[in-house]
């Protein structure tokens, strides 16, 4: 059903139907932002990546060729822009990790917030230490809820390779996180 809706949206986009762009944005904005945050670990940069993807989509809609799903196309666009950002910032890799918001509850005490904040910083630092291929697979699987088959298509790799990258990435994250809490 989603594929059918996406094909209809693409058809409408190519014919200049403005509400179709609004629907694509509403449908995929949160997923793409969550994915971009996991890949670039900076909220402002992630928002820029997602905005660039939608601006690029709007500017190139007349030449748009989506081989698979619109979701896959947009995810691949976010991946490409995040990779470009990493390459552009290769010299400045020592920035601060993103801190995600603590879930809003009335009972968030300062000591719990500090603990949550510290754990998130350590997790982001551990993610930063993963090889790019492993970090990408872990992020796509856990944050964007993509299957290994979908990730394999996006990375042009075999499913076994993607599963291995995921497994090794989780093992390394576990080791890095445990070493922090033991020290």
Please report, for each region that a protein language model flagged, where it lies by residue.
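Internal acidic/polar
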Residues: 2-6, 84, 92-116, 120
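Structural recognition of an alpha-helix C-terminal capping motif at a helix-to-coil junction
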Residues: 34, 48-55, 68-80
């Amino acid at each position: 059903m989603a594929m059918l809706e996406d094909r209809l949206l693409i058809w409408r986009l190519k014919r200049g139907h403005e509400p179709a762009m609004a629907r694509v944005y509403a449908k995929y904005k949160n997923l793409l932002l969550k994915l971009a945050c996991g890949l670039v670990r900076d909220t402002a940069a992630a928002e820029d990546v997602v905005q660039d993807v939608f601006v690029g989509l709007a500017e190139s809609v007349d030449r748009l060729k989506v081989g698979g799903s619109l979701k896959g196309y947009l995810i691949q666009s976010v991946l490409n822009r995040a990779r470009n950002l990493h390459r552009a910032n290769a010299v400045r890799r020592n920035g601060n990790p993103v801190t995600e918001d603590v879930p809003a509850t009335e009972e968030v005490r300062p000591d719990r917030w500090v603990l949550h904040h510290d754990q998130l910083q350590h997790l982001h630092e551990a993610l930063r230490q993963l090889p790019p291929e492993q970090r990408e697979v872990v992020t796509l699987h856990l944050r964007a809820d993509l299957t290994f088959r979908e990730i394999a298509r996006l990375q042009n790799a075999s499913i076994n390779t993607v599963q291995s990258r995921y497994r090794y990435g989780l093992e390394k994250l576990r080791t890095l996180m445990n070493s922090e809490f033991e020290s």
